[in-house]
């Protein structure tokens, strides 16, 4: 195994907070659509400065809903990184669009310098993938996406 991210340091720093949150959910007895979900949705929408935040069951559902909300479907292309998990690709295919892969940079993230060349008339979205505690260069990606 190649260790690229020491998640245990982060977990150790937040362990009590995580265990307390899980304990509260189980003590409440409502595992689905409970008060913790509502609290998360409110905080998420506030943090993102949007009207609504909707908790879903998994990444595939979240990306599929986002693509459908943007009317992305058959005949469209969505750019993402070649270094991604199956849910990213599954969501794009679920929406009816085609996947266009862009290679990675030295940090294993989408190579921003290659995105522009991948764009064509069918391109409707770019889905960056943040990995190993690293963020993609979202400012650069958003600047490309706005064009």
Where are each of the predicted segments found?
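Phosphate-binding glycine-rich loop
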Residues: 30-77, 91-95, 101
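PLP-dependent aminotransferase-like
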Residues: 68-147
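N-terminal "arm"/small-domain region of PLP-dependent enzymes with the aminotransferase-like
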Residues: 1-30, 35
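PLP-dependent aminotransferase class I/II
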Residues: 8, 20, 35-43, 47-53, ...
